[in-house]
Amino acid sequence: MLHHIEIYVSDLSKTNEFWEWFLTELGYVQFQKWDHGISWKHGETYLVFVQAEERYLDVPYHRCRVGLNHLAFHARSKEHVDEITEVLIEKGIPILYQNKHPYAGGKNYYAVFFEDPDRIKVELVAPSMNEGIS
């Protein structure tokens, strides 16, 4: 089981504004907060966002470089994916792969894909009828 993930960000304030509503919607609660970071916990796992030092901001994040590609979260249902999609649109957050949405991951993969302020790709995936089948 995953204990935690720590992500360094370019602007902690923007990051928290972006992630707070989404993580709260998924059942996460604020766990820790300090001058240069914040964490959100769900069960025993938590997600940490830390302000990167100025000297490390010159090379922006890109998901195709070595390192993290994206974060994927469980949705409660297809309807939940649709509800979150509507909120994203209301907030002006672009939906990735719009021409294939909500099946950008495949015909049996109902999800919404979007990016946070640092362009970290985020995915919210509905349960599949095929999950658990090997």
Question: What function would you assign to each model-found segment?
Answer:
Residues 1-16, 71, 128-134:
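N-terminal beta-strand motif that seeds the catalytic metal site of vicinal oxygen chelate
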Residues 26-35, 47-51, 76, 91, ...:
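Long, contiguous binding/interaction regions
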Residues 8-53:
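Core segments of cupin and vicinal oxygen chelate
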Residues 9-14, 72-117:
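Vicinal oxygen chelate
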Residues 42-76, 82-83:
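Long, continuous compositionally biased terminal/linker segments
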